[in-house]
Amino acid sequence: MSSFDYLKSAIKQKGCTLDEVAEPSGMTKGYLSQLLNRKIKARARRS
């Protein structure tokens, strides 16, 4: 299970929407959706 599979499962179990998760994490709903559905790869974090 990848990190994104775990995150997707946790979001579903908590009954959260993508909006509720994306905003506090600094992502757009669209970007988060693409990550969770493996449409794109996560960018490396910059220091």
Swiss-Prot record:
The keyword NAD applies. It catalyses: beta-nicotinamide D-ribonucleotide + ATP + H(+) = diphosphate + NAD(+); beta-nicotinamide D-riboside + ATP = beta-nicotinamide D-ribonucleotide + ADP + H(+). Coiled coil: none annotated. GO terms for cellular component: cytoplasm; plasma membrane. This enzyme has three activities: DNA binding, nicotinamide mononucleotide (NMN) adenylyltransferase and ribosylnicotinamide (RN) kinase. The DNA-binding domain binds to the nadB operator sequence in an NAD- and ATP-dependent manner. As NAD levels increase within the cell, the affinity of NadR for the nadB operator regions of nadA, nadB, and pncB increases, repressing the transcription of these genes. The RN kinase activity catalyzes the phosphorylation of RN to form nicotinamide ribonucleotide. Pathway: Cofactor biosynthesis; NAD(+) biosynthesis [regulation]; Cofactor biosynthesis; NAD(+) biosynthesis; NAD(+) from nicotinamide D-ribonucleotide: step 1/1. Keywords: ATP-binding, Cell membrane, Cytoplasm, DNA-binding, Kinase, Membrane, Multifunctional enzyme, NAD, Nucleotide-binding, Pyridine nucleotide biosynthesis, Repressor, Transcription, Transcription regulation, Transferase. It is found in: Cell membrane; Cytoplasm. Residues 18-37 bind DNA. Residues 7-47 form the HTH cro/C1-type domain. Disulfide bonds: none annotated. GO terms for biological process: NAD biosynthetic process. It is an enzyme of class 2 (transferase). Its EC number is 2.7.7.1, 2.7.1.22. This is Trifunctional NAD biosynthesis/regulator protein NadR.
